[in-house]
Amino acid sequence: DLIRNCKRMLLLTSAGMSADSNIPTFRDKDGYWKNFPPFKEKNLEAQDLASPWAFRNELPHAWAFYEWRRRNANDNQPHEGYRIINEWFKKCDGFIHTTNTDGLHLMSGCDRDRILEVHGSMWRLQCLDTCTHQYWDDVSVPLCDLDNETMRASNFPGCIHCRSIARPHILMFGDGEYTGHPEQGINFRNFIEKSVDLAILVGSSGAVPTNDYIALHLMESGTEVININLDASSNQIVNTDLFIEMKGKDAFVELNRIAFE
């Protein structure tokens, strides 16, 4: 009934949402080292490469990391859960607040006015030297050359304004140069100004608790919150009774069956 009768719904999606589409979470350090031996040799962890420091000091490796991720996302497809969310949004006023940068919600056909990619998107670029606060779309695959043996990139994309090197339009670790997406931010603020009937928290982790705190705030103001996560400990912050210990894809398929079939 919560889903079927919902008038205003907020989806709070994190890494666990896209994991079923073969998008790595990089939480498993051993798995990360296995996938990228050259990074292990230099002791470059994922958060080291996802930083402005890497783009200034380890540029070939930094762009290789993101080029690999762009190609991986391009080779995979949004899973059934994304389609189900889009179908639900045809029945209610909905919005997606995602910490994911893989662009899968938009690839699945999500309305561009109904999403805030709060950490940015790997499918947009901005100037590494911040010659302007503008950003631009670039969905080219490949975007630059990539040597998978050495995990070094070359022929980097350039800024369309000053011809310097471009970087992903993503909020990285230790990043004071991310230009943000004001339009998406305004759309989210406008949505959240009115009461929300149901918030669904998906695949969040304690490492990036952005969505957890939004869910907690909404729950304290009377919004029903469903938490979908394979990790039972993920419910410690929100502590909702509506906890579903399942993968994101499987949970949405089951919830859709219960609500509408």
Task: Describe each PLM feature range.
Residues 1-261:
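Conserved catalytic core of sirtuin-type NAD+-dependent deacylases
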